[in-house]
């Protein structure tokens, strides 16, 4: 049974004021009340929206590795307790503030939020919402923000992949890995080698567009890549694992190759041997998609609108690996943390 979250326990922004026009009943939310402890489902009183804000009836919310980290106090952003995790969602506009011009009540939208979208309602600024084209489902749209926003910037903005180039993608069966494969093969006409930790995950990555797969749990990634492409190497490596997998990816690059670091899912952050960069004129770079929201919003927003456009045109095909109900949010977190997931894991709020 959902618990009632008392006003005394909430940050000031959450406090329920006198009900106004468009304001609705209490809604359910997954709430972190103590770090490193299971989330609880609580009833939250809605607050009035500001003039630039939009209230959204959330249908789907993505679950990301960062959500677990923030609930453990291990993320770079540390919201005060209690808080609701969740940074991406899809849904329908319930109410728009007086100065909102980009969306209206009834519009289907995707959006990003600062860790508060694992709830039946979410309030966010109008500029962090994008309307969903008619032929794109709410579920497919919910897969797009973090995974495809990252993939598009990694493939185009950072690596600048060209048609016919060979791209090595690690953690290839994860949500972002599959998104990178999708964008690189179906939009940029690249040849992708998918690297993952099991034969089943490699098979899925190949079904989603990769030309070949390498199970790096069975031996040297570098040696396996060399067997596929010879001594010339790959043009681009996009790594989300870190540690030895990053180093093998770096050593697999061709002359003037590029490597893009998206994360360290393996838990180890490798040091970059600068002599390898020098000898092959290699470019090593990082990509933290969420940072663009604050540093270069035009680039951030374009990655979202581009993802929606690609989806509308049928160029990309978002993959949902599993869907959990809100009541099973802790099972969903465990599913992601135990590396059981492939593709995007979603919470369904309906």
From Swiss-Prot:
Family annotation (SUPFAM superfamilies): GroES-like (SSF50129), NAD(P)-binding Rossmann-fold domains (SSF51735)
GO function term, MF aspect, one: oxidoreductase activity
Sequence intervals crossing the membrane: none
N6-acetyllysine: residues carrying this PTM: 36, 302, 328
Residue runs in coiled coils: none
InterPro entries with a match to the protein in the record: ADH-like_C, ADH-like_N, GroES-like_sf, NAD(P)-bd_dom_sf, PKS_ER, Zn-ADH-like_protein
Residues that bear N6-succinyllysine: 201
Record bears the keyword Glycoprotein: no
EC number: 1.-.-.-
UniProt entry keywords in alphabetical sequence: Acetylation, Oxidoreductase
Top-rank EC class of the record's enzyme: oxidoreductase
Keyword Oxidoreductase: yes
Family as reported in the entry's similarity comment: Belongs to the zinc-containing alcohol dehydrogenase family. Quinone oxidoreductase subfamily.
Protein name: Quinone oxidoreductase-like protein 2
Organism: Rattus norvegicus
């Amino acid at each position: 049974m959902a618990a009632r979250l008392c006003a005394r326990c909430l940050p000031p922004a959450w406090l329920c004021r006198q009900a106004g026009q468009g304001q609705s009943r209490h809604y359910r939310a997954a709430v972190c009340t103590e770090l490193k402890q299971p989330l609880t489902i609580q009833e939250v009183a809605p607050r009035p929206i500001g003039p630039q804000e939009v209230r959204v009836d959330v249908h789907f919310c993505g679950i990301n590795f960062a959500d677990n980290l923030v609930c453990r106090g291990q993320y770079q952003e540390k919201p005060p307790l209690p808080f609701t995790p969740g940074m991406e969602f899809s849904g329908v506009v319930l109410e728009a503030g007086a100065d909102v011009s980009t969306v209206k009540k009834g519009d289907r939208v995707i959006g990003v939020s600062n860790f508060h979208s694992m709830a039946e309602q979410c309030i966010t600024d109008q500029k962090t919402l994008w309307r969903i084209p008619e032929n794109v489902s709410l579920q497919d749209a919910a897969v797009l923000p973090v995974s495809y926003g990252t993939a598009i910037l990694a493939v185009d903005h950072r690596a600048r992949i060209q048609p016919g180039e060979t791209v090595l993608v690690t953690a290839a069966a994860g949500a972002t890995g599959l998104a990178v494969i999708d964008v690189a093969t179906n939009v940029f006409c690249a040849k992708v080698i998918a690297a993952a930790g099991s034969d089943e995950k490699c098979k899925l990555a190949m079904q989603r567009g990769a030309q070949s797969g390498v199970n790096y749990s069975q031996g040297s990634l570098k040696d396996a890549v060399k067997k596929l492409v010879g001594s010339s190497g790959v043009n681009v490596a996009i790594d989300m694992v870190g540690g030895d997998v990053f180093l093998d990816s770096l050593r697999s690059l061709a002359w003037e190759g590029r490597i893009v670091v998206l994360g360290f899912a393996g838990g180890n952050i490798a040091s970059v041997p600068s002599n390898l960069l020098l000898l092959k004129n290699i470019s090593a770079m990082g990509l933290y998609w969420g940072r663009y929201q604050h540093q270069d919003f035009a680039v951030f927003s374009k990655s979202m609108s581009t993802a929606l456009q690609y989806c509308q045109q049928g160029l990309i095909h978002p993959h949902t690996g599993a869907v959990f109900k809100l009541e099973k949010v802790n099972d969903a977190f465990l599913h992601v943390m135990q590396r059981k997931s492939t593709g995007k894991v979603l919470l369904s709020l309906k």
